[in-house]
Amino acid sequence: MKKFFRKIAGYIVTIYANRIYRKAVKEADRVHAERGEMIYVASSIEDVRELVIYNRYKFRQMKKRLFIPKFYISNLKDGAWYFTPDRSGKNGLTEQEREVRRLAFVQHVLHRAKLV
């Protein structure tokens, strides 16, 4: 019976993680369409299950405020769950990369919920 409830909890957490991811990606795409700048979707520092949207300026402010000297934009790009293309439309994620990162986020949330 315990395995059954664990499996149901896994499905619910998976649905929850997919919902959070899609919402953050939609918001990042909306901001990118308005401003044209590169937007990154990464995990929040306070709550790993929460996704935060950064642009480069906001990232630099957070870096100064939290005193993270060894974290650069290239680290953010590698560690982000999603990022939009730049102004010229280059350097964005392909559909395959996007799907891989979505699945990695779902696995990350399942791991944090101790269901994997």
Task: Describe the predicted segments one by one.
Residues 2-116:
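Acidic/polar low-complexity segments and flexible, solvent-exposed patches
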